[in-house]
A protein has these predicted regions:
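Membrane-proximal envelope and lipid/glycan-remodeling enzymes
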Residues: 1-245
Length: 245
């Protein structure tokens, strides 16, 4: 919703929805950079001679909703935990029992490898064992990432003109997001343990739609990827709610 209203140049709603998302997933604060860039770009499209300072003076009220939501979160955190930035995460068992804290560079390598690991093979040709937490092969669980990476490379070669800033910004934000996630002690449950990673998908999907090539071949290839991704996540949903994984 934040991205949708940003593209509609409705900054108040865009920043308010972004604040809601950050309240749930603080790491999504990174994408505020993208939203502000797009809002400035949209303003300058309507006002070619306009400046960032003029935008601030004219649209200052855009931050009211965002600020109100942020203050409400901080007030709730203070009332519950005596700290405006603490929302209960540090009180979870996995964080109270560790000496290395919630975030630490020592987690980075292992967590990155978790996002590459394949399902474990069963003994004597038994069934594959899928992980239910802390990540697994991102390209297997969300094959749309394959399309996103491919489209980015295509656009870098074919569509640089007029897109260069976003072609640089989006992957940098995604990589920064990934590194922050992987410096977190846990990668979470659900979506085969890829829940945190999937938070970046709306923003990457925006890039995909913006840069994708035209033509039937692109559609045909992605139909195969769509069917594969849908099938494995349908199986995962059934398996999860039946407590098979």
């Amino acid at each position: 919703m934040a991205l949708y209203y940003t593209l509609q140049n409705k900054g108040g709603l865009a920043l308010a929805f972004w604040a809601c998302a950050v309240g749930c997933r603080p790491m999504l604060a990174l994408y505020g950079i993208l939203l502000v860039y797009l809002l400035v770009k949209g303003y300058k499209k309507e006002n070619p001679k306009g400046t960032v300072w003029q935008l601030v003076k004219e649209k200052w009220y855009w931050v009211i909703g965002c600020g109100a939501i942020a203050i409400s979160y901080m007030a709730l955190n203070y009332a519950r935990f005596g700290n405006i930035t603490e929302f209960g995460h540090n009180y979870l068992p996995e964080f109270t029992r560790t000496k290395t804290g919630q975030f630490n560079l020592s987690y980075l390598r292992e967590n990155l490898m978790h996002y590459l690991r394949l399902p474990a093979a069963g003994e004597n040709g038994g069934a594959l064992s899928f992980f239910s937490s802390d990540g697994m092969a991102f390209w297997l669980i969300a094959p749309i990432f394959i399309t996103m990476i491919g489209v980015w490379i295509y656009a870098l070669v074919k569509k640089r003109e007029g897109n260069l800033t976003l072609l640089i910004m989006l992957p940098l934000l995604a990589v920064a997001h990934l590194l922050i996630i992987c410096c977190h002690k846990t990668l979470g449950g659900w979506q085969f343990g890829n829940r945190y990673l999937l938070d970046m998908m709306p923003y990457l999907f925006f890039g995909l739609v913006l840069w994708k090539p035209k033509g039937e071949k692109f559609v045909q290839w992605n139909t195969v990827i769509l069917v594969f991704g849908f099938a494995i996540n349908l199986i995962g949903t059934v398996a999860t709610y039946n407590h098979w994984i």
